[in-house]
Regions:
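Active-site C-terminal subdomain of aminotransferase-like
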Residues: 1-45, 58, 128-129
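Hydrophobic alpha-helical scaffolding
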Residues: 6-9, 70, 107
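Generic non-transmembrane alpha-helical segments
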Residues: 22, 42, 46-50, 79-88, ...
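Short, well-ordered beta-strand elements within core beta-sheets of diverse protein domains
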Residues: 24, 67-70, 105
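A short linear hydrophobic-aromatic micro-motif
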Residues: 52-56, 88-94
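Conserved PLP-binding catalytic core of the aspartate aminotransferase-like
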Residues: 53-84
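PLP-dependent enzyme catalytic core of the Aspartate aminotransferase-like
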Residues: 86, 95-129
Length: 129
């Protein structure tokens, strides 16, 4: 009788359309990939700069999206999370079974946010290092 067998997930299709339009407005996949590489590179450069922060992934296995690292002690990690939250950063506490710090810098996370986080990390190291 010409009826559809199911109802398409209209809201999901609408949201996917918005995401695709956003991606195109950013220059497409190549531009988004390059931006993600720059963001991750800035954060990893800070982690590797002095040894105060220690990356948890091997260099050839580092994620561009979820950057994990440790501080010299669990006490300092707790201070880092508390002070970073007070400074406006959210969700940096690592996984409950692993600990440490996890910065999630997904596609829509702005490069300025990474610059701000790196600045916070440098100030934290000066204060507590």
């Amino acid at each position: 009788n010409g009826s559809m067998y199911n109802t398409p997930p209209c809201f999901g299709i609408y949201l996917m359309g918005l995401v695709m339009k956003w991606g195109l407005s950013q220059g497409g996949l190549d531009a988004i990939g390059a931006a993600n590489q720059r963001k991750a590179g800035k954060l990893y450069a800070e982690i590797d700069r002095t040894g105060y922060y220690r990356g948890t992934a091997e260099n050839n296995s580092r994620s561009r999206m979820n950057i994990t690292f440790r501080l010299p002690s669990e006490e300092l990690e707790n201070k880092f999370v508390k002070e970073s939250t007070a400074a406006g950063f959210d969700g940096l506490k690592g996984h409950r079974s692993v600990g440490g710090i996890r910065a999630s810098i997904y596609n829509a996370f702005p490069e300025q946010g990474v610059k701000d986080l790196v600045g916070f990390m440098q100030e934290f190291e000066k204060k507590h290092g």
